[in-house]
Amino acid sequence: LDNRPKTLELASKLLINPLRSSDAARKRYVFSDGKLNLLPESPVSFLTSDLLSLYGRLRVMYEFFAPRGRADDETLADFARRRLGKEAYEKLIDPMASGIYAGNPESMSLKSCFPKVFNLEDKYGSLIKGMIKLQREAKKSGKRKVGAGPGGTLTSFHDGMGMMIDSLKGYLKERLRSGSKVVSVERKNKGYAVHLSDGMVVETEILVIASPAYSASEILKNLDRPLSSVLSEIPYPSVSVVCFGYRKERIADKLDGFGFLIPYKERRKILGSLWDSSIFPGRAPDGYVL
């Protein structure tokens, strides 16, 4: 997403141009009741959409009047059912959360995973009330429209996200050391000693660990055992990404959209599908789709 100026500044410094997603990427689908349903993009399209039943749509509108929650935190599932109703949770919130985290909304902390949503209820007492007030404030100040989500436009690069990594490697040159596994970290003087698998020790005053929690847990055992223990308890869902390429004429649908997500209640074996060649140009050879 292009809502982080520092990322765009880095791309500019590396002399690589961001590639914005196509207009088709705005169309997103949910597989429900045996068919693909277009996600509503506006309040009007939501009212006329058949993704939710009439009762389900009315229940979402009742959110405006629903009482404020009393708990300091709750799961995303509990929050969604309480404020939006069971049907909206199952068909909208569940697949949305799975698409972002690939996890179970029944165990996701609302405050940690969706702080903007938590703050809307906490500050305004209602998601709808909060959105209306934020939109009015944004209009007065001349800002772009705001939302409860991260906002921004989906952005990549001509040769994919790997282009930024390759450009960073070229920019850093000998200052970058790759292919060496970090075995452990320990305190040394006023800084840290980083032990690598090839026997080399790197000493530094500042250390940033940008790895999965389970890897950081192993690295930090000798430095901070309590922190290592906490990191080891953070759950990670097991996810596989499978890429399929087809000749365009073999696909009946024109794949005009971002892709689709599947609610857990549908009991399918996949979380969803992204239509990469529809999102960004150059992701598949001519005559093919990815």
Q: Where are the regions a protein language model picked out?
A:
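Dinucleotide-binding Rossmann-like beta1-alpha1 core, especially the glycine-rich loop
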Residues: 1-68
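Alpha-helix/helix-capping structural signal
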Residues: 5-6, 95, 214
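Short, surface-exposed acidic
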Residues: 18-20, 86-93, 228-232
